[in-house]
Amino acid sequence: MTWDRLLPSRKFLLAINSWYVLALVVAAISFAVLAIGPWKNEKSIEAILTELQSIDVDCALLQRNVLRAHAGLLRNYRPLMVPLGRVRSSIANLQQLFKKARVEDVGELSELLARLKSSINTTDAAVASFGAQNVVFEDSLATFNQSISSLLRTSDSRDLNAAKVPELGYLMLQFSFRPNTELALQITQSLDQLQMSTNADKVAIQEVVRNGRVILGVLPRLNETVKLVQASGTFENTKKLQRAYLEADSLARVVEQRVRTFLGAVSVFFCFGIVILVHKLRRRTDRLARRLDFEEVIKKIGVCFEDSTETKQSLKSSAEAALGTIENFFEANQCVLGLVNVTENEIAETFSASAPPPSWNERRIRKIVSLVQADEHGSIFRDYPARKASCFNEDAPGRWALVAFKVSDRLVAVFGLRFDRDPVQPASSEVQLMELAAGCVSHYVVIRCKQTQRDILERRLKHAERLEAVGTLAGGIAHEFNNILGVILGYAMAQNILHRRTYARHYIDRINAESNRARLIIDQILALSRRRERTARPFNLSALVREIAPSLRVALPSEVEVDFNIQSAQMIVEGNPLEIEQILMNLCKNAAEACIGTGRIEDSVYRSFVWKHKVLANGTIPAGDYILLSFEDNGGGIGQAALPHIFEPFFRTRAQCGGTGLGLSTVHGHVSAMAGFVDVISTVGRGTRFDIYLPTSAKKPVNSESFFGPEKIPLGSGEIVAVVEPDPVTLERYEETIAAFGYEPVGFNTFKGLTDWVLAGKEADIVLIDHSSFLDGERVGSWVATLEKVPIIMIGQHQKNVSISADGEASNHFLQKPVSSKALAYVVRANIRTE
């Protein structure tokens, strides 16, 4: 996976997580280093203990040297000063080491170090005092001994014995080794006696007495000083300091061990956190990679639906290709999608990526749909059922992962993935991907269906526009063509004036019949263009087809064989027989043109019941009872590209045949007008079949003669009929026709001529006015005020902006052109004033 493929938000999240991992790694290493690294300087500890031992040794050496100096074994006092200097140096070193080890502020150690320093200072002072006193003692003792010896050489022995000088020397020797009070008293007495001697050397005696007394005074103090040095607290303070330091060090080591354990635990915890975070990052990376792959799948699904054609086959192939992409992505063995119509509670569309598609269990489908509709918190239904609990029948092996959701208010999508293996429950992220994939395909399918419906509506709109064009064309030629038919019908109907039958009357009747049929054809064209209301009545379709069959055989080429398969039972539909005649003629002519050389056309009429909603090539048909009018040929067939457009006006598949392109459009218009449906099945090279479904009618059928048959024309009794027609030829025809019906015609070229005639005192029983008599649709209420209650009949198009009655009480009627003589006779007879 590359960073370029990630969204900025995903890059930011991954960057944050990477910094988290880096921070945890640094923290874990730091805590591990702190846990295993040295905390205390072992050299400092060793140096402190060495200095303490050195103080012990130097103090012991000092005490020994003091004793040796006191015993006179030392020639100088350097052996005393050297250990004392080392002790002072050790104290200074201890202070520096304690400061370096950061234990100088520890209360007990600081106090013990102060005591040790104080005891050393005391010892130092005692040693200094010992040195001074010992010098005085040794000098005095040497002088004393020398003076005693001098007295013994120079003085009389009798005087010396009397003064106990020899004994004094012996006592002083004893006192110097073992001083006590008794010896000091004896020596003092001896010194007093010696001082009182008169015969000896006075100077020597004075030296003996003085030095003896100095020895007696200095030696006890010297011994006390020696004892003070020997009893110095340096040893004890050193031991206490050593024990306290060792205890503090041991306690510090325990704390250090605990801290090390804690730091190690924290480091291990961070390591576990790193492992977990790396695992999560790996999973997130996998999910992101999965998402990226899924985005590629979504793009491929979009590509599958980029087909420009909107046919049903294209939709099926696109959906199957998209489902195949999803099937490969999830490594499934089959992928299916069903769209359920909620209103009709049935499956509208099914798609499968792999063949054969599974058969759906409608009962389980309805249950799933009900669960989706009953879900209040969302329209998603997820399930991973056992092998025998999915929405498919038992012929669908494997285990299915199902997702059902609402596509719209009318559609529920059921999406399934089949796995031949028995996988574990899918993760929530995989379920979300399934939902997104199913929703994407469903969305494209619905969009394609809507596009198809839109195209159908567009074709219908174009169809309506072309019909409008046909209507405009028909309206443009209707006036002239209707005038021609009117003249033909008018003069043909003049035969009613003749009371005797002639040989030519038969031909005139044929002229009337064909003119009436031409008028009906014009009416059908105008009805197709929505310019005239169609006439619909119930009739027997099977009887009508039997009646028309001979004419169809004659109208088609002899090389084309036409077979009719018509059920004998009555098949009542509601419509216009002429529409059925045009449907039969157009479809049979198209079938004959599709047959190359010899061909065969089979026309069938029978009842057909559609049990459920059915999809046709040109729409859908609801369930119900229908009359099926089927046309099947073995011609060349219709190509798939042309099939969606065959009902469009002016669309021609065979330009060389010279057709107008209105045949199938007229068929579709007539079938739609009869509330019917058209289905087309065509295979190129094999033929085409048109199935026309017409709804049945329960009404009583009428005879076909009610549409075309002759009726007796009502005649007048000399009533006055006023006619307003600008065209002189048409006016003459109206006058002749009205006269033939037994009325008295009065013709006018303008409406003003009629009003002038009325104002002159004339009166008409009924007035016929051509719509072209009103210039620019002007209001002529003031002109027709003189007509009072005379019935008025307008001929031509109904002009809503033309008022033809002054008081609104007169009966007004409109006759569409062309006006047949029969229709004119009926309207005049029904509305003429008889008072």
UniProtKB/Swiss-Prot annotation:
The chain crosses the membrane at residues 19-39, 261-281. It comes from the Bacteria. Residues 476-698 form the Histidine kinase domain. The modification 4-aspartylphosphate is found at residue 770. Residues 720-832 form the Response regulatory domain. Its EC number is 2.7.13.3. SMART domains: HATPase_c (SM00387), HisKA (SM00388). Its main location: membrane. The modification Phosphohistidine is found at residue 479. Gene3D superfamilies: 1.10.287.130, 3.40.50.2300, Histidine kinase-like ATPase, C-terminal domain. It catalyses: ATP + protein L-histidine = ADP + protein N-phospho-L-histidine. GO terms for cellular component: plasma membrane. It is found in: Cell membrane. Coiled coil: none annotated. This is Limited host range VirA protein. The lineage of its organism: Bacteria, Pseudomonadati, Pseudomonadota, Alphaproteobacteria, Hyphomicrobiales.
